[in-house]
A protein has these predicted regions:
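Long, charged, low-complexity intrinsically disordered regions
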Residues: 1-33, 40-100
């Protein structure tokens, strides 16, 4: 079973918080897969901030990095990939969860 969540409009901080909440909730409910719609970063306002990396200012790059760097989350993750075109392609990521 798949859980789908749209992160459009979230700041990086809020998106990371929500991603963690959703992953941990899905683990408890034995979800197998999560589709996060991140967008392609075309309309990202954070590029104006010189202190933020251009790539990591976009959710499609920062969300996977956040998950990999958070030990509470990464231990539950089987894989993180771009979605198939029919599921949003480059504007979405598929998280497959481990069976625990």
């Amino acid at each position: 079973n798949r859980f789908i969540f749209d992160l459009h409009g979230f700041t990086l901080k809020d998106a990371n918080h929500k991603v963690k909440e959703i992953i941990l909730s899905c683990v408890k409910r034995n979800c197998k897969e999560i589709l996060f719609i991140t967008g392609k970063g075309i309309h990202s306002n954070t590029e104006k901030d010189v202190y933020i990396s251009k790539d990591l200012s976009k959710l499609k790059f920062s969300v996977p990095e956040f998950i990999k760097s958070d030990l509470d989350l990464s231990k539950h993750i089987l894989s993180i990939n771009s979605a198939e075109k029919s599921d949003g392609g480059d504007g979405a990521i598929i998280i497959k969860l481990k069976n625990l």
